[in-house]
Regions:
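Short, surface-exposed patches at the edges or C-terminal ends of soluble domains, predominantly
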Residues: 2-339
Length: 339
């Protein structure tokens, strides 16, 4: 972010955006406690983010530039958390370009320890709400009943949209050999044998009656003919009535993406719009069971008192940490402009 054309600020209160027809107000809510994540013990192997030192070692020399020097950038787990914010900047800029409104990034508990439940302070000036489920389960982030009710009322407003994405659930099995098989499948040395995310988003979805659950961490297939570009999505275009995936071929490659399992038999209420082909060269319990694709985008159309749309998709899709292209930006724009 060294190329920013305006000064950056910190420690400011959010200023509400005024409603303007045709210009959606988009907000993102990161459902983690930053201190709870940053203060995890690096001596503990599982259920934590990497330290920045570990990132630099594994991805060397990608993070050896002066902006990553210890005199300028945190080297502990906090450094890895800040990489997320670096990687969301392009998404924020694209949204602002097409809506005319800045995209605020709220945190459940921020770096300074300020807590922000998901309430009207976030929702009052929001038309499209992203909830990023990047909280490790061990930090025990759970929405209060009042938060669930606030989001329920938000979705009763005409034209609203909730985009929610619990991150991956790696190593849920007590069988250590199965955990190791998962690890060898995704191949990311920075992800431990057990890394379970999304208590907050899981509980929020349960409270709202969204019958979807994040499972596994699966490695997408790539196309050898296109220099390793991620394999195209399998898209149910006949179900995509709102055009969420218009002009979209693919999302971005990431070594361990969640499968969004639909937990209801009611095919009318939940639609799997996109599936991602899996790298079948690396065994995994999910592929061993005969699966070749995982659900990567799920949509619930307005129904009953819920006047807003619900999309379930991983937060990785809105980050450039793992790459971004024209197809991905088109998806961002589709969501930001859907009215």
């Amino acid at each position: 972010m060294g190329d920013a054309k305006v000064a950056r600020t910190y420690n400011q209160d959010h200023k509400a955006r005024q409603y303007a027809k045709g210009r959606r107000r988009v907000s993102a809510y990161i459902a983690w406690s930053y201190p709870a994540e940053a203060n995890r013990n690096p001596a503990v192997l599982d259920n934590r983010f990497s330290t920045m030192t570990e990132v630099r070692r594994v991805l060397w020399p990608a993070y050896e530039g002066p902006q990553w020097d210890p005199s300028r950038f945190q080297q502990g787990i906090g450094g890895s958390l800040e990489l997320f914010f670096w990687a969301w900047v392009r998404f924020q800029r694209v949204v602002e370009e097409v809506t005319g409104h800045a995209l605020p990034m709220f945190q459940r508990v921020d770096q300074a320890g300020f807590a922000l439940p998901l309430d009207e302070r976030v929702l009052a000036d929001t038309d499209t709400l992203f909830v990023f489920g990047l909280d490790h389960m061990v930090t025990e982030q759970v929405p209060a009943p009042a938060e669930i009710e606030a989001v329920r009322l938000f979705l009763e407003r005409e034209g609203t949209c909730l985009v929610i994405g619990p991150h991956h659930d790696v190593g849920q099995s007590p069988d250590l050999q199965e955990r190791n098989l998962e690890y060898l499948h995704h191949g990311d040395a920075l992800v431990p044998r057990q890394q379970r995310f999304g208590s907050y988003t899981r509980a929020l979805m349960n409270g709202l009656g969204i019958p979807v659950e994040n499972r596994w961490g699966l490695r997408p297939a790539v196309s050898a003919a296109e220099n390793g570009r991620i394999a195209p999505l399998t898209i149910a275009r006949d179900l995509d009535e709102r055009g969420w995936l218009a002009g979209v071929r693919n999302f971005n490659f990431h070594m361990h993406l969640p499968h969004y399992a639909v937990t209801t038999e009611d095919a009318r209420s939940v639609h799997v719009l996109a599936r991602q082909p899996i790298d079948l060269s690396r065994p995994h319990p999910f592929t061993n069971a005969g699966n070749k694709e995982f659900n990567t985008l799920v949509w619930m159309r307005p129904e009953g008192r819920r006047a807003g749309d619900v999309l379930v998709v991983d937060s990785t899709v809105f980050s450039t940490l793992f790459g971004a292209d024209e197809s991905l930006e088109r998806f961002w724009k589709n969501i930001a402009t859907a009215g």
